[in-house]
Amino acid sequence: MAIQAQKGTKDMLPNDAYKWHYIEEKLRKISAEYGIREIRTPMFEATELFKRGVGETTDVVQKEMYTFEDKGGRSITLKPEGTAPAVRAFIENSLYADAQPTKMFYFTPCFRYEKMQKGRLREFHQYGIEVFGSQEASIDAEILSLVMRALTEDFGIKGLSLNINSLGCPKCRAKFNEALKQYLKENYDNLCETCKTRFEKNPMRIIDCKEKRCKEIVKEAPSILDYICEECSDHFSKLKAYLDVMGIEYNIDPQIVRGLDYYSKTVFEVIKDGLTVCGGGRYDYLVEEVDGPKTPAMGFGLGLERLLLILDEEGIEIPEPVRCEVYIGSMGDNAKLEAMKLAFNLRKAGIKAEIDHLGKSVKAQMKYANKIGAKYTFVIGDSEIEENKIKIKRMSDGEQFEVSLDINEIVNIVK
């Protein structure tokens, strides 16, 4: 049996690569508009980073990570998300010593061993933003404005819902967790086994459980917004005011807790037809948790596979770039030499040029040129070389003409 791609992975073929380039270019552009610069972190990290950063009781750490021991006996994990590695890089490279806030974005593959679903594979790709050094609600609103602008204006997606919540600070959550435990007590026996463990260690994680029975139980659970302190409530009010002044619509959803333990205060999700397009929030204690200085932070992740799926389902076309501007057909060895020289010079002038590498007949060459969408076809033979001329056909209307083999004249025609 032939070796195949592993379950949960997918090849990105040349016919699809331009779609990825398109969305990455759009996201790079809007990142630059907000003064956000790129970071690249390794594909694998110490397992301890994710245990401490993401949270021991999360599904990600308990069930989904690709973890192995390397030849040096170190526990290594393929990164399941982008925030913890960005935090590690922020600390290790002393970026906290720079002028704050520090704004960074990334494109990264992530790996999670989870049940595959629409738009989600075991190897998937994320665009993420992390902002360090500001505790102000204004930075949260700024990042949310970027998200909604990118999705609605740059990509033209309709029917999106921005849902926000506040998880408060550790003191708020302690009060909420007690109230939540009191509520869950009478349904304890109906919880899944994982949530029974969470009941004592981290009851708020039960709200994020994907099991149907647990989802039903938490529908009427207390709202954390009834337990946040005055400072956290003020932060949430300011966030809403900033969103209002920018004209960004939102819904308040007290059941958004996100699947990772590091979140505090603001959390959000962008929903389309019941699926989460992207999500994130504030994590003011994570940098300190992984041995850095006390640093407030905010970030989010956007799944690129899911984004491409939505664009396809919405019928939003991604413009396909011209693959070949000039195809140079040749007859004979001398003509092939001239074709090679001409293609080289056209490429130097920034023109996409192709020649025959299979020894095809001129008819077959022209058929191939049409198949790859060449805008112009050239034909060179011995007579053209002797007369220092070349035959050109404009494929859009079929017009044919002869011009000198002078590269400057040819460039002026096809550009």
Curated annotation (Swiss-Prot):
Cellular component per GO? Answer: cytoplasm
Q: Which domain of life is it from?
A: Bacteria
Q: Which E.C. number(s) belong to this protein?
A: 6.1.1.21
Official protein name in the record: Histidine--tRNA ligase
Protein localization: Cytoplasm
Residues in a coiled coil are none
Q: Which organism is it from?
A: Clostridium perfringens (strain ATCC 13124 / DSM 756 / JCM 1290 / NCIMB 6125 / NCTC 8237 / Type A)
The primary site where this protein sits is: cytoplasm
Subunit and interaction comment? Homodimer.
What's an example GO BP annotation here? histidyl-tRNA aminoacylation
The gene for this chain is hisS
Q: Name one Pfam family in it.
A: HGTP_anticodon
Query: What SUPFAM superfamilies does UniProt report for this protein, alphabetically?
Result: Class II aaRS ABD-related (SSF52954), Class II aaRS and biotin synthetases (SSF55681)
Query: A GO molecular-function term, please?
Result: catalytic activity, acting on a protein
Family, according to the entry, reads as follows: Belongs to the class-II aminoacyl-tRNA synthetase family.
Transmembrane segment boundaries = none
User: Keywords in UniProt for this one?
Assistant: Aminoacyl-tRNA synthetase, ATP-binding, Cytoplasm, Ligase, Nucleotide-binding, Protein biosynthesis
Catalysis performed (reactions):
tRNA(His) + L-histidine + ATP = L-histidyl-tRNA(His) + AMP + diphosphate + H(+)
